[in-house]
Curated annotation (Swiss-Prot):
Keywords of the record: Ribonucleoprotein, Ribosomal protein
GO molecular function: mRNA binding; structural constituent of ribosome
Gene Ontology annotations of biological process type: translation
UniProt KW RNA-binding keyword: no
Record has Membrane as a keyword: no
Pfam families: Ribosomal_L35Ae (PF01247)
Name this protein carries in UniProt: Large ribosomal subunit protein eL33x
Organism: Arabidopsis thaliana (Mouse-ear cress)
GO terms under cellular component: cytosol; cytosolic large ribosomal subunit; cytosolic ribosome
Family to which the UniProt record says this protein belongs: Belongs to the eukaryotic ribosomal protein eL33 family.
Top-level taxon of the source organism: Eukaryota
Length: 111
């Protein structure tokens, strides 16, 4: 069997979960704030609207032959002017995901 030729290619951009959307006294766990690497303005966020997110984590018990599980989400809109996005996941992200990495995929494309 032949080995892989050339460099590995990532088909996603890394993002960091900052926390839940919140006000002074309430937090809204159905919406999460994500900082995407290399995105610093509200205009750059517009390209990521509708793109898929994946929070991948490791669980203790095996399901479907794997210890790894995934919660899928979608970028919904910008949050502020500094490149942070609001996103909705199929189930609310667990508290241990704060500060963790998410994958921001390049699809569905709107070009």
């Amino acid at each position: 069997m032949k080995g892989r030729q050339g460099e590995r290619v990532r088909l996603y951009v890394r993002g960091t979960v900052l926390g839940y959307k919140r006000s002074k006294s309430n937090q809204y766990p159905n919406t999460s704030l994500v900082q995407i690497e290399g995105v610093n303005t509200q205009e750059e966020v517009n390209w990521y609207k509708g793109k898929r997110l994946a929070y991948i984590y490791k669980a203790k018990t095996k399901k479907n032959g794997s210890h790894y599980r995934c919660i899928w989400g979608k970028v919904t809109r910008p949050h502020g002017n500094s490149g942070v996005v609001r996103s909705k996941f199929t189930s609310n992200l667990p508290p241990k995901s704060m500060g963790a990495r998410v994958r921001v995929f390049m699809y569905p494309s709107n070009i």
